């Protein structure tokens, strides 16, 4: 019996297309949400200049704080975290189980936004928003590690690295294997984005939290 081409079964093509539609939509929505450069937009609207020419050049909340505008930094932190959370929630609304995929896409979007020639932030706040929706206890532990580290050492970058390392450990301890895999990926990307900070920490040249430029 001769097998018929798939093209002769339009119903099968439609079903296959529909199976791909939800994951693809989650990826696109996640990336586009993540790529919104709130820090850059807020500093420009607030008259604080081009964030990319300030401090580390990052578009995240820590660099916004270096402008001396604490309100803008807080708003950036909330919005960057919020877009990560929103990506997960929207993806779960499209199809349950797609949240982690959309969250990862949002994280990549923040770090590599197409609008800024793929030169974005370091993703810590966005990652926290993602984790908050997927597992608030893990998010609470990571935030606590970050806060404790910053209070003790006064380096946001060091706190971010320690928080990124603690998140997958906490998830694994809670038996959340799939979440652990996602958090390992996020942690590796966060370390990669902080490679300049790591070098400055090694040389003793990393600016401390709250230092204005």
Predicted feature residues:
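C-terminal ends of transmembrane helices
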Residues: 39-44, 109-119, 146-153, 194-199
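Loop-to-transmembrane alpha-helix initiation sites
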Residues: 140, 156-164, 174-186
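Helix-coil boundary and interhelical linker segments in multi-pass alpha-helical membrane proteins
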Residues: 8-26, 82, 86-102, 132-138, ...
């Amino acid at each position: 019996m001769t097998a018929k081409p798939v093209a002769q079964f339009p119903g099968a093509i439609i079903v296959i297309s529909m199976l791909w539609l939800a994951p693809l939509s989650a990826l696109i929505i996640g990336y586009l949400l993540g790529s919104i450069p709130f820090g850059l937009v807020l500093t420009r609207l607030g008259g604080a200049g081009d964030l990319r020419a300030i401090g580390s050049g990052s578009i995240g909340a820590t660099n916004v704080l270096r402008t001396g505008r604490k309100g803008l930094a807080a708003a950036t932190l909330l919005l960057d975290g919020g877009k990560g959370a929103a990506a997960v929630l929207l993806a779960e609304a499209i199809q349950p189980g797609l949240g982690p995929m959309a969250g990862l896409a949002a994280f990549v979007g923040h770090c590599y936004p197409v609008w800024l020639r793929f030169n974005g932030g370091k993703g810590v706040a966005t990652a926290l928003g993602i984790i908050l929706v997927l597992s608030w206890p893990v998010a609470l532990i990571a935030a606590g590690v970050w806060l404790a580290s910053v209070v003790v050492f006064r380096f946001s970058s060091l706190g971010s690295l320690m928080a990124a390392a603690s998140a997958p450990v906490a998830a694994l301890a809670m038996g959340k294997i799939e979440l652990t895999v996602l958090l390992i990926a996020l942690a590796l990307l966060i370390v990669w984005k902080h490679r300049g900070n790591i070098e400055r920490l090694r040389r003793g040249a990393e600016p401390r939290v709250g230092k204005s430029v």
